[in-house]
């Protein structure tokens, strides 16, 4: 029963952490009045493209987040849980190599400690990101509306 609940909690937690990173993109889109509907595809790339020329500081921060190993591990685990076979269980799947070779073998599951570390690290990264974004938005409004 404990493994079941841990797996369930891990799935939900990783899904929500990733979703919160994505929600901030919608906040940024609204902040700059980009007119992108929340259901449109490629919203992240469209927002980042806009920021590249219009807000270099936020652009750099988002690029740094996307290349962060903690973010990448969290995203990878979340995608596996959502779209593939669970990394929380031992499994046997084909592995496709660039050379065209296909190999088979048993892939070990991630340990509870590994999953817990990914969740904790991801939450810390999300907190840092939200703190940065909050200060950035505050500065945005000060510059936009507090013209003395």
Labelled PLM ranges:
Residues 20:
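Short, positively charged
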């Amino acid at each position: 029963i404990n493994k079941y609940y841990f797996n369930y909690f891990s799935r939900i937690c990783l899904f929500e952490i990733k979703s919160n990173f994505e929600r901030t993109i919608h906040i940024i889109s609204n902040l700059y009045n980009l007119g992108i509907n929340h259901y449109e595809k490629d919203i992240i790339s469209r927002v980042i493209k806009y920021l590249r020329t219009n807000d270099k500081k936020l652009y750099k921060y988002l690029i740094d987040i996307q290349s962060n190993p903690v973010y990448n591990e969290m995203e990878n685990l979340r995608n596996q849980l959502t779209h593939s076979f669970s990394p929380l269980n031992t499994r046997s799947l084909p592995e496709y190599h660039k050379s065209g070779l296909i190999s088979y073998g048993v892939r070990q599951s991630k340990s509870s400690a590994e999953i817990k570390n990914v969740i904790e690290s991801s939450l810390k990264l999300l907190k840092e990101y939200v703190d940065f974004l909050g200060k950035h938005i505050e500065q945005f409004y000060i510059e936009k509306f507090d013209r003395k």
